[in-house]
Every structure is written in C-alpha cells, then in structure tokens.
C-alpha cells in the first residue's frame, strides 16, 4: 500500500488551528520562496512564514499528532518529520506538476504528507493529483484528514475554482527508504497485531514479532 489516508485531527483541533492561522494575515507570503528551482515555476499559492513563532508552535503540534498515531507510525516508520508548513490556495491558484526535493536542510524526503484544514465541500477544484507509473490518483480530503504518499511521485494541485484550500504539508524521513520494504513491514505488523487482538498472545506470534523487529533492524538506517 503506497498511500495512507486517515482522520488525524478532531473538529476542536481543526477550529483551533484555523483560528490561530486567521490571526496571522501579515505572515502569509509567496509560496515560491520554499520551492526548488523547477517547482517554483509552477507554484502559485501562499504559505505562512516558517520562521514565525506561530508557524513553529503549530508545526510542533502537528508533529505530535502524527507521532501519536500508531497507524501512521507503522506505515511510515518516521525517523524525522520535517519541513512542516501551512499553505493557502485562493481562487485561480494552483500548484503544477512537480517532484519534491529529495533532500532538505531538515532531512531526506521519503514520504510527503498533506493535512486538510478545510473540508472538501467548501471549495471547488484543488484536487491533489498523484501520478503512479501507469495511472493518476485524485484526492480531495475531509477537514482533519491526512494523506501520506511517496515523495518520489510526480504530483500537482488543481486550480481553485471557488473558495479557499487551507492545508498543512510536510515530509517524513523514514527509517526504511524503500517503498516496497515499508509495505512488507506494514503488512507484517498489521497482520501480527490483528492476530494478537483476535487470538491473544502465542509462541508463534512471538516469532512473528521477533522477525518483524529483526527485519526492521536489518532494513532500517
């Protein structure tokens, strides 16, 4: 499984984030400032100044929420969560087809994530398009929902036709770089935990958990 979508934030958390972000109208700046040389040519959005105190505070809260999710930790095996920023797209804004930088000053980008702070029914357009080898997948998230996907995929955000798209984005450096290896480990972990919940502990399950832990040691970096 290369993609993960999950409800990360509850309504009260979403409202608190939006309230804080709406206070900082003077801190929104051209999104091209943090894009690579190629991506900056197709990036048209606004982002909260990453060096501002409110950006640092809210980024810390987002990081804590991600690390509190057992499902996300099993899927992404996060070593470093970094580059968190809040972006806003208004009418006629979009982010054209691009690839994320492999390395940033804060870490390697193995996985990218987007958390929607506005509900998908409050704006038109703005779909996230992710390109696999022979197909495209289109995502439009509920408020508080996160999507995590490989940073190696080309992706884009369609033009906003009406309304406002407010999201939090960031990157994950994983303990395991390989997409395939992460998928095998995720399946093994999910299967073992499912059997534990259904049947309780057993000697056979001990061996499965042992194999999972040792595979993580072998494949991790």
From Swiss-Prot:
GO biological process, one term: DNA damage response
Binding of 2-oxoglutarate, residues: 165
InterPro entries, A to Z: Oxoglu/Fe-dep_dioxygenase_dom (IPR005123), PKHD_hydroxylase (IPR023550), Pro_4_hyd_alph (IPR006620), Pro_4_hyd_alph_FE2OG_OXY (IPR044862)
Keyword Iron: yes
Enzyme Commission number(s): 1.14.11.-
UniProt KW Oxidoreductase keyword: yes
Domain Fe2OG dioxygenase: 80-174
Entry superkingdom: Bacteria
Cofactor note (record): Binds 1 Fe(2+) ion per subunit.
Protein name: PKHD-type hydroxylase PMT9312_1262
Organism this protein belongs to: Prochlorococcus marinus (strain MIT 9312)
